[in-house]
Amino acid sequence: MTEYKKVIAQNKKAIFNYFIEEILEAGIVLKGSEVQSLRQGKASIDESYASDNGHEVFLYNCHITEYEKANRFNHSTRRPRKLLLHTKEIKKIIGKIRIKGYTLVALSMYFNKNNKVKVELGIAKGKKLYDKRATIKEKDWKKDQSRLIRQK
C-alpha cells in the first residue's frame, strides 16, 4: 500500500548537487499562519539545510511566504524551524553531520495522511564538478535511449 503524500515543495537541486546516502522523515514546528501558507503551496526549500543546535535539529533557509490574511500575527519568512525527531535519530544525525563533507539537506516538504507537515531530509555528501558532469551525461544517454526505442 502506498503512503499518501501531498507534496508542498521539492528540492531538485539537492539530488543534482549531492550524493544522498540516507533519507529520514521529520516533523516540523510551525505557526498557524505558516500552515495556512503551506496549504496554498507557497514554500521553497531550494537552499534549505538542517543543522544541530545542541541537542536539537533546526531547518534553516526554508522560505515560507507570509500568509496574506494573518496581518500582525504573521511569521518571519526565513526563521529557523525546529525539527521533531526521536533522541536516537538526533544523536545519529549529529554523529554523521560532524564528519567532514557531510550535510543534512531538505529534499521535500509534504502533508502526510493525517494532515501533518513533514520534511524529508537526506544525509548527503557534496559532489565534485566531474561527478556533476557524469550525472548530466547519464541523463542525456537515458534520453537518447528512450528516443531510439520510440523511433523503432
From Swiss-Prot:
One of its GO terms (cellular component) is cytosol. Keywords: Cytoplasm, RNA-binding. It comes from the Bacteria. Signal peptide: none annotated. InterPro entries: SmpB (IPR023620), SsrA-bd_prot (IPR000037), SsrA-bd_prot_CS (IPR020081). Gene3D superfamilies: 2.40.280.10. It is found in: Cytoplasm. Belongs to the SmpB family. Required for rescue of stalled ribosomes mediated by trans-translation. Binds to transfer-messenger RNA (tmRNA), required for stable association of tmRNA with ribosomes. tmRNA and SmpB together mimic tRNA shape, replacing the anticodon stem-loop with SmpB. tmRNA is encoded by the ssrA gene; the 2 termini fold to resemble tRNA(Ala) and it encodes a 'tag peptide', a short internal open reading frame. During trans-translation Ala-aminoacylated tmRNA acts like a tRNA, entering the A-site of stalled ribosomes, displacing the stalled mRNA. This is SsrA-binding protein. The lineage of its organism: Bacteria, Pseudomonadati, Pseudomonadota, Alphaproteobacteria, Rickettsiales. The gene is smpB.
